[in-house]
Amino acid sequence: MTSARNAESSLDPGVMRAVRYHDFGGPPRLDRIARPEPTGDGAVIRVVATGLCRSDWHGWQGHDPDIRVLPHVPGHEFAGVVHAVGREVRRVRIGNRVVVPFVCGCGTCSWCRSGNAQVCPAQWQPGFNGPGSFAEFVAIPRADFNAVSLPTEIAFDVGASLGCRFATAYRGIVDVGAVQPGEFVAVFGCGGIGLAAVMIATSCGARVVAVDVSREALALARASGAEFAINAEADNVDEAIRGVVPTGVDVSVDAFGSAATSGAAVRSLRVQGRHVQIGLLPPAKIGDHATIPMHTVIGREIRVLGSHGMAAGAFPRMLADIESGTLDPGRFISRRITLDEAPAALMAMSDGSAPGVTIILPGAEVG
């Protein structure tokens, strides 16, 4: 007797294609490996679409201590169809369209019970704590708690852009930063998270200042609602922002993650402003160097706020905003590639990220 229920069991060869790296920083490659099986409370998802994110690059470079077993399958933003479920699963059904947050909570601790699974001490992250979604199938734990129903009105590629970047920006702007109508918001870094932050802040009624070194990224930010665009390579950012808002902005968001962007973001704030740090600053990358000018934080009584994903239970509000047309994350998708093309795309991130969001389609044919 099998311990799991699955679709197409008679046709299941038990093998799948997956991108793996065998050494940190070494060339990732497309391998054929065993297809995962669900745990008792888990599910296996057939990956229809998965996002390529800078966090995947950090993991590949060895910046994430949770990746302890090599070879490793990266990928943490995905949407797909439930292929198999464990014996204990009651809510999730085979064939369901789902999206999964990149932080999967335990579902029982005080943080999960209070709606804050994104900081669950026993959290599990696909692509970091275990095999990820750069594959034809991915397994997740505690499916009833972590799998979110994806409305049929939202395409899979759009759904794949939500689990990390868009959801993180949504919570960072709406809940953590508590952006209000009429406030000035400066967004540093207009990649996937930054562009989402621009769009979401604009939808909240804020006036957005976008900062990036790429003209193309700034053009996308303008198209997403930014009222002002500052080229950090050509302009003195501090002076340029004060030229827009002499007293400083109300909220700053570092969506990139570097000593330069986090410092500039804090300096851009008014007295008693709010800084939201979303971009990663891993110790393996920056060492012990201070990234926040604490004298400015103290002197201006600035609030420094971290934002780490969004719990599955909070997704319906964001999905409703997408269904209603208030938010349109699909406009950020700039490239769709096959699983065969994913290794080269991951390596190319060492030379910088292309503007917009890249989506990998594991079921797509080459060419």
What is the role of each PLM region?
Residues A240-S252:
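A short acidic, Gly/Pro-enriched loop at the edge of an enzyme's catalytic core
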Residues E77, N96-R97, W111, F137, ...:
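Residue-level marker of beta-strand positions
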Residues C106-F188:
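NAD(P)H dinucleotide-binding glycine-rich loop of Rossmann-like/cofactor-binding domains
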Residues T2-M16, A34, G263-V266, A311-G367:
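C-terminal hydrophobic helical "lid"/dimerization subdomain
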Residues R97-V98, I154-A234, E239, I298:
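Mid-domain Rossmann-like dinucleotide-binding core that forms the NAD(H)/NADP(H) cofactor-binding site
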Residues P36-T50, H63-S110, P151-E153:
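Glycine-rich beta-strand-centered segment in the early N-terminal region that forms part
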Residues A259-S324, L361-G367:
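Glycine-rich phosphate-binding loop and adjacent beta-alpha segment
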